[in-house]
Curated annotation (Swiss-Prot):
GO biological process: spore germination; sporulation resulting in formation of a cellular spore
Native organism: Bacillus subtilis (strain 168)
Protein name: Sporulation protein YpeB
Highest taxon, organism lineage: Bacteria
Similarity annotation: Belongs to the YpeB family.
The entry's keywords: Germination, Sporulation
Amino acid sequence: MIRGILIAVLGIAIVGTGYWGYKEHQEKDAVLLHAENNYQRAFHELTYQVDQLHDKIGTTLAMNSQKSLSPALIDVWRITSEAHNSVSQLPLTLMPFNKTEELLSKIGDFSYKTSVRDLDQKPLDKNEYTSLNKLYQQSEDIQNELRHVQHLVMSKNLRWMDVEMALASDEKQSDNTIINSFKTVEKNVGAFSTGTDLGPSFTSTKKEEKGFSHLKGKQISEQEAKQIAERFAPDDNYSIKVVKSGKKTNRDVYSISMKDPDHKAVIYMDITKKGGHPVYLIQNREVKDQKISLNDGSNRALAFLKKNGFETDDLEIDESAQYDKIGVFSYVPVENKVRMYPEAIRMKVALDDGEVVGFSARDFLTSHRKRTIPKPAITEAEAKSKLNKNVQVRETRLALITNELGQEVLCYEMLGTIENDTFRMYINAKDGSEEKVEKLKNAEPIYKDL
């Protein structure tokens, strides 16, 4: 009798374990399929965007009307921006693809800077048309290479997840067709992009992709990176894995993953090899019922920054918002009463227990430096006179921002309203030009079940 019961219980346990394993396998396959679909979508969109880019640049070469040329160049700039976005969604962060991205930036910067000037007063000269023709030829080379990769992907049913795993393991990469093809794209772009002269009137405005080699401190080991990561683990039960960044990249970081098997929580981090500075942190866990206020969450975020060596006395809060049960905050350093927006630090705090679940200091670490900040050439009153007459100005301060051309400019930052909408406007403190206008989000209404 007892033996029969034990056999039955054991049988149920085996069936249950098998079913659990089957469900786990199904969930894993679903996640992998979702990632693969996203990679495939981004790649095919990139190929289509480069096709569009080549055609659009060719169209501008045939135009004779300055009235038509300006919007066409804006289209070129828009397409290059979309192509950049597609590249960022591919698993290429661990392999060099800098030359191709740099060429896209050159095309985008040239087209934008040319389109915003008065082409009736200052039309394209002979050198600029020559430069545009070179960019047209180079975009054709990228187009042909990407079409070749697309043909291989579709004809051989190649998977992008294999690319991600090959790059992460740094093993047998030479056997991966997609990796080899993208290396060919990068090699060919590097061969011709160095000879592209966009003329004396053009200064590249591409924001340099900075690494962390300029940071203070010594080079840390994997073990030291692990010890630093342990400070961010909520308890001792986390298993920590450290991975170096890929070869020939400018990331200069250790990538950390920390897993808690009991709570099914995962923390991902990047820590700089030089100085051991945390670059970003993301904690993937369920946030339960809210128990602390948004203001308390901001105080927890500041305490986190102070604990990790940031001078919190020099920080001002720029953004404070709540999304569901998570507080989102942005802090900006202030120097001589000027807000330094290129050095912003962003945080997410869970409002159930005040734990930091998101942190990014990448902008701060790459941009923080001593600057000579010029004095405003126009007064605050002169800056206000440049605004739309319907704007009611509520607040004004000086701020350093990065404009659409990737240049740092000193501005008057003004918060103003038009009826029920709030706007943030930036007026160049040197020449009074309008650099940027942002509409701030209104408070979201809360809908309850009727």
